[in-house]
Amino acid sequence: MAEPESEPNATFELELFLPGRPLLPKDVKSLGLPETPPSLKVAVTQHETLNDLRITLNDSPEGYWLGAFRFRRPDSHTRKGELVNEWEELQEVFRHDAPHDRILQVSHEPYNETEVRLHIQRLRDLLSGTQSDPASVSVDAGATVHDAIVHANEWAHDAHMPAPPKPSWRGWPQDGTAQLLPALARYPRVLPKCVRGMALSAWNPPPKSWALRGHLLYLSIDTLEGDVLHITASVNGFFLNASSSQKFQPQPHPSKALHSSSLFDLLCAASPLFLQNFALLFNDPVSTRDYFSALPVMNSLPAAPWLAREPKHESDPMRTQTAFLLTGAMSADTLDGSRDWNEELQSSRELPRSSLAERLMRDRVLNRLYAEFTLAAARVVPRVAAGEVAPMNPADAPAAHMYLYNNLFVTRGTDSVDMYRFLGGDAAAHVAVGKDLQGVRRLGNLDIEGLSLLGTVVIDWLGERWVVQTVLPGLFRQVAADAAASQSDGSTASHVAYGGVEGPDTIHTDPAFHKVLSVAGKSLHVAEHKMRDAQGMEHELCLSVDCKGLRGTDGRMYLLDVSRHTPMDVTWLDHDMEGSVLEGTDTASYPHRLPLLRPELIDAYWDMHLHEFARDKLARQRASNEASSPSTATSSQVDVSDFSLNFHPDAFAEFRTGSGDDARVIQPATDESIPSIAAVRKVSEYLRKEVIVRLISDVAAGLTSAVDGIALTNRMHARGINMRYLGYIANLSQPSQRDHWDQSVVSKLGSGHEALVQAFRRVVIHEMVVRSAKHCLRTYLRALPLMEAAACIAHFANCFLGTEREPSPVPKMPEVIPASTASRSESHKPWMSLTPAKLVEELRIDIRKRFRFELPMFFLETELRKPQALRALCLKMGIQLAVRDYEFEPEAKHAEGQAAAPSSNATKEKTTTSSRSGLSKKGKRAFPPPPSKPLRTTTFVPEDVVCVCPLVKTSTPKSSLSEDAFEAGRISFVRGEREIGTELMLESIGFYEQVYGLVHPETGKCYSKFASFLHHYAAEFAIKAARKASADSNQGSSSDGDRIGTNDAGSADGSKTEHDDQLPEVVKEVFTLENALRFQRQAVTVSERTLGLDHPETMTQYMNLAMMEQSSANLDDALRYQERVMQLWQLLYGRDHPDVVHTLSSIALMLQMRQDYEPSLRAYEASHDLAVRLFGPNSIYTGNMAHELSQALILSGDLKAAIQVEKEAWRIFQERLGSEDPLTKESQALLSGLAATAVRAAKQQHARELVQTRMPSSARSTRSSAHHHHHRHLHQQQQNSSSSPHPIPALANRSIDDLVEYIQGTPGTGSSRAARKRAARAKRS
C-alpha cells in the first residue's frame, strides 16, 4: 500500500462524505446557499490532525451548519463505520491506505450541553455579521475601506446614491479630517436581518425529569414572519416544542413536526424569510469581493481608527447570555476556574521543537496564547482603574496597590516604593516599565532553553501606565515567608536566587542561573562582569545587577526586571541632563536619569565592528597566503571566533546604597580602562557623532524620509536612535548645520535637497509638540473619573488646536445625572482651569525638558498643522472621535474660503476645485447633505469623543521559522534555483498564515513582500519573452546570410536566454501579474485592519498596489488608489511633502496612458508647480518635472508652451548633469525638434497668409473650403499657448525619438532648408 508523502509539510488529498440536509428545499442553490456536495475533497498535510480538520470544516461554506459530528471510516450507506481518533496525525491514520482509499465519513453524533452551546454561539456569530460588540475595547475596530475605494460604483448602488464619476484629476481632495473614511464608507452598511431576536428561553435550565429525557437547553427565536419559535435542544438535535411565554410544554409541537441535527436547517425550514435573508447574508458582496475584510482578527488586536463610526445600538437579548454560552455556568460554584496563564505560556514554550512540524505547532500555539493573554489584559485594566477589583494590599497607598484578577497580576507603572526616587521617581519608573517589556520581548525572541519569562503587557489607559503580568508560581508565598523572616531576626530576607536586591547592596549568584544567563548575555552582547556588594564581596554576573533570577515553585528559572538589558547612554548623562537647550537660552533638567541605549544600536555597532574585524583579518590572511602560496591567496574564508566586543550593562549606572541617613548614590562601574566599559562610551559617541549625522545626510540625499510621527519613530528606532534625540535632530536639520553632516554625502548634493531636510525637520518638530501634548494630557487625565474624560479631552483639544476658532474656550461638562453633594464639592479639577496660554507654556517647558530644544517662537500659532496634530494626539492617547470635518478656523473665515473655492484655478496647489474629493463632479451633489446641527462655538465638544481605548504594548515573540523560510526561498530564487525558491516562499506564506492567522500585521507584510517579488520577476520574465519573440521574428524575416551571421555571433547569448525562458511549471504558474495583484490587495486590506486606515505602511501598500494596477493596464483602479494616496498625504503631512511630486507625476502618467490628456496636463502642471515651490527653479527634481510636462504639452498640441518648458528642463540638466549626460542629450534633441517644427509651422503660416492676401475673396473662400481637412492637422500644431490645446492621440504611446521624428517630419519632405538638411543627413546615414 502507498503511504502519504514523506516530506515534512507534504500535502495529500482527503475525501469527506458529509451527511444530507433533508429540511432544505431542493432549489437552495438558486437562493444562494451552496449545495452539500456528495463528497468534499480537502488538501491536508500529514502532520495535521482530524481536530485541525474539524476547525477547518466548521469554518467552511460546506460545513458551517454541522453541529456535533465525528469522523468515521466508511462502512456502508446504512451502517456507521468505526470512529477515528481525532488527535492522531493524518499520516498515522492513513499509513496503510492507498491514495484512493483516504476517505472519511462525517456523521452526526449525540449532543452534549457544551456542543449545543457552541453550535448556538456559531449561529449567533454568523447572523450578527459585522455587527459591533459594545463590550469590545474600542469602536469600529478593524475597519477597512479598501472595497469602498475600488468598488465605489457597487457601494453607491447599495446605498441608493448616484454613481461616482470616472476617476480623473480635478485638483486636490477637500482638506478635511473626515476623508479618513471615503464618503461612501461613512454610511453604515445595512445587512439583512435573519431573525428579529434570539435568546435563551426563560424556561432554562430543563427540569430534572426532562433532562433525563435528553433535553439540554431551550431557545426562543422571534422570526421575521412575526412568530415566536420555542426550540428544544436535545441530545439528538433540535426540534420545535409546544411551549409559549406563559406555558411550559417542551415536547414536540403537534402541528410543526420539524427536527434536525442542525439549528441552521431547522430555522431554514421553519422560517422562509430566514432562509432568504441568510442566503443574502451568506453571499454578502463585500466579503465575496474582499474575503479578508470579513475575516475575524484573531491573533492581534485590530486597529482602532481615530475617527470612528459610532454604530447603532440594537437590542440583543443574547448579548448578556454570551457568558453562559461560553462557560455554561449559572452559579458561582459551577464557574470554571480562571486560566493559569503562566502555566499555559511556560508549557507552550516547552513544547518540542526538534522537527519542522513541531516548530510550526509551537509557534502557532504561542502566538494564539499571547493574543488571548493580551486581550484579557486589555479588558481587565479599565475594570481595575474603575475600582471594580479589590486590591491585595488595601492598607498601602493607592499608587502601591497590587491587583490579582483571573490570574493576572496588575500594578501601576509608577515608583510606588521609592525604588527610582534618586533616578527621577515616576518618570524613571515609566521608562523602566517600557524597557522591561522591551527586554522580555528581546529575550523571548532569543528563545533560550531553560529560561522562563513572565507574560508581560504594558497598557496606557487614561493617563496612567499599567503593567499586567502572569503570576510567578509561589511568589506570594515566598514574599510572606521573607517578611516573616525579616520580622523575626531583623535581617533582610530575599527569595532572589540571582542578581541584586534593590541594587548592589545584596547580590546573589547561582551556578544554574549563571549557565543559562551566560547564553543570554552572549546573544545580547553583554559582558560578564564583577560587582561588589555592601560587604565588598565580588560577584560575577552575566546581566545587569538589576536583573533578578527567581525559582518558581514549579521548578522553573524565571528572569525578572530586565529593563537594563542595554547599557546607559553616557554621552547624554554627561551633556544633556542639565544646562541650556538647543536653539534657546533657557535651562531645563531632564526628567529622569535612566537614558538607555536601544538594542538596534548595540546590534548595528557590534555588526559593524565584526565586519571590520573580518575584513582586516581576511586582508592579513590573504597577504600571508600570497607570501607563502600564491595559489591560496584568493581564499575568502575567515575565522571570527576570536572576535570579542561586549558591553558592560552597569557601566555609568547609578545605584542607591545604604538606607536612611546613610543612603547615597554611587556609580560602581566607571573605569574605562576595562574594555567593556570603554565600549559603552564609544557606542554612545557613535550614536551622536555618526548614526544621527548619517540619518540627516540620508534624508538630504533622498534615501529616507518620514511622512508623520509613526514613520519617524520607526526610522529612528530602526537605526537605534532614541526619541529623546528629536531636539538634537531638529537642530542638526537646519541649513546652518550643514557642515556637521556627512561630507561624503553633502559633496554630492545638488539644489533642492533643502526641501527634503526641511520637510523632515517639520515632522520632527511636530512630533516633539505632539509628544509633549500627550504628556500634558496624561497629567490632566490621571486619576480622573471616566465620566469626565470626554469633557477633559475636548477642553484640552480646544486649548491646543481650537484657539483660532475660540481664543478663550470654556470647559463644558457632559450632561449626566446630577452629582451628589460630595462630588460637587470636588467638582473643580485642574483641567478645568486650563487656558491656551497656560498650555502653550506647559508645552514649551516639556519640550525643553524632554528634548533639550527651544520651540521656535509662534510655532504653535502659525506653523502647527492642526489636522495632523489632532490625528497624532488621538493615536498616541487612544482617543476615538466622531467622524466629521473638524474646523480649526473661525466660522466667517471658513465660509469665505468655501465661497471662494469654486472660482479658484484648478491647476494651483493652494486651492481646491472639488466640493467633496478629487473625483467629484462639479455642480452635482453626489451625496445627501449632512443633517443640520446646532452651531458650534468651539472646535470640539465632549460629545465628539466616542471612545477612549487602552493602548497595548505586548511582548509577543516573532516566529523565526516563517521569516527564515521566506528569506531562504528568496535567496534561492535569486541565485537561480527557481523551483525550490518558489516552493519555499509559498511554504513560508503558509507558515505565516498558520502561525499568525490570515489577518495579522506580520502576515500582511509577508503578502506585500511576496507581491513585490512576484511583480518584479513577472515583469522581467515578460520582457525576456518579448525580446525572444522579437528576436525570433527578426531572425525569421532576415536573409540566409544574415541569419547565419547572427547565429554565429550570438550563440552564447542565445543559449542563456533560452535557459532563462525554460522556467519550471510552478514558477510559470505562480509568477504572474494577477498573483502579484492578488497578494498586494490582500496586503492593503490586512494593513488597514491591523495597522490602521491611515498608517504610513498602509499608504505605502496603496502606492504599490496603484503601481501594479498600472502595469496591468487597470488604469481606473490605479487612479482610484492614487486618489486614496492623495487623501492620506493630506491626513499624514499635508499637500507639500516632497514625495507628493512623484505621486502627482504618477497620476498624470496614468491619465496619459488612458489618453485623458487635459487632466493629465493639469496633473503634470501641479507636479511641476509643486517641484518649483519646494525644490526651487534650478533643482534636478524641477528639471525632471519640466521634461515630463513638456511631453504632456506636446500631446496636448501646445507646442509653444512645450518649447518654453523644455528650455527650462534643458537648462537645468545642462547645469546639473553636464552636456554629456543622456538626459541632457534627450532634452536637447526634443528641444531642437520642437524649435524646428515651430519655425517650419510659422513659415508655412506666413506663406498661406501671403497667398490669401493676393487672391480674390471668392477664390480664397473656395480654396479654404477645398483644403480645410488637408490643413486641419497643421493648424493644430500652429496654435499657441493662449489657444485651447487639442490632443494628438497618435502620439500617445511614442518614445521621445518618435516624437522628435514626428515633429520634424519625414526626411525629404517640406520645402524649408531644415527639411532639406534632414533629408541629406538621412541619405548619408
From Swiss-Prot:
Record's compositionally biased regions (Basic residues): 1265-1275, 1314-1325
Subcellular location: Cytoplasm
Domain of life assignment: Eukaryota
An example Gene Ontology biological process: mitochondrion organization
Low complexity bias (residue ranges): 1276-1285
Keywords: Cytoplasm
PROSITE patterns, alphabetized: CLU
Entry's Gene Ontology cellular component terms: cytoplasm
Gene3D superfamilies (alphabetical): Tetratricopeptide repeat domain (1.25.40.10)
GO molecular function: mRNA binding
Residues covered by region (Disordered): 893-937, 1032-1063, 1245-1325
InterPro entries associated with the record: CLU-central (IPR033646), CLU_dom (IPR025697), CLU_N (IPR028275), CLU_prot (IPR027523), GSKIP_dom_sf (IPR023231), TPR-like_helical_dom_sf (IPR011990)
Sequence ranges assigned to domain Clu in this UniProt record: 311-573
Quaternary structure and partners: May associate with the eukaryotic translation initiation factor 3 (eIF-3) complex.
Known role: mRNA-binding protein involved in proper cytoplasmic distribution of mitochondria.
Record family assignment: Belongs to the CLU family.
Protein name stated in the entry: Clustered mitochondria protein homolog
Native source species: Malassezia globosa (strain ATCC MYA-4612 / CBS 7966) (Dandruff-associated fungus)
